[in-house]
Amino acid sequence: MHRSHPSTTRRKHLIKEMMEDDYELPTEQQQIVRVVRSCGNNLHEVETATPESENFLVSMPNKYRKNMWVKRGDFLLVEPIEEGDKVKAEISKILTNDHVKEYTKAGIWPERFAKNPPQEAKAQNDDEDSDFEDDLTPNTNRPVQESDEEDEDTDTESSDEED
């Protein structure tokens, strides 16, 4: 009988845990933060919802390491730790868009983060800049493919001019 690799099983359970999350509201000790940058060694610099507070480091717990990833702009639920001087909290939950929606409905989502969540801002930019693809530089590693649509457009224009 073939047994799956322990890390694969662990990853499956973590993903299942995140998908079946009941969107439990944060406790009084926990706070919502946004990732500013990744510092390596499972440490991430985060900013809080209060603008006057300084950025600080949070650590990724062992259960998430090598299984879950966070990037700049992601939201986290962190819990403070006592023993750290520079590292002041540990990640307790990686927040998804569904968490953001639920927390906003509950009225606990911070105002500072409500203005432009990265995913919604990106969706708005896609709606506003429909010609975004025109700004891209062409890929010189592939042969240029001429589309038939352009030929049809020029054919219809020339036939309109003839009438």
Curated annotation (Swiss-Prot):
Segments forming domain S1-like: 18-96
Keywords annotated in UniProt: RNA-binding
GO terms for cellular component: nucleus
SUPFAM superfamilies per record: Nucleic acid-binding proteins
MF terms (GO), sorted A to Z: RNA binding; translation initiation factor activity
Keyword RNA-binding included in the entry's annotation: yes
Region (Disordered): 106-163
Biased composition (Acidic residues): 126-136, 146-163
Pfam assignment, any one: eIF-1a
SMART domains on file: eIF1a
PANTHER family noted in UniProt: RNA-BINDING PROTEIN EIF1AD-RELATED (PTHR21641:SF0), TRANSLATION INITIATION FACTOR-RELATED (PTHR21641)
Record family assignment: Belongs to the EIF1AD family.
Name of the featured protein: Probable RNA-binding protein EIF1AD
Species of the source: Drosophila pseudoobscura pseudoobscura (Fruit fly)
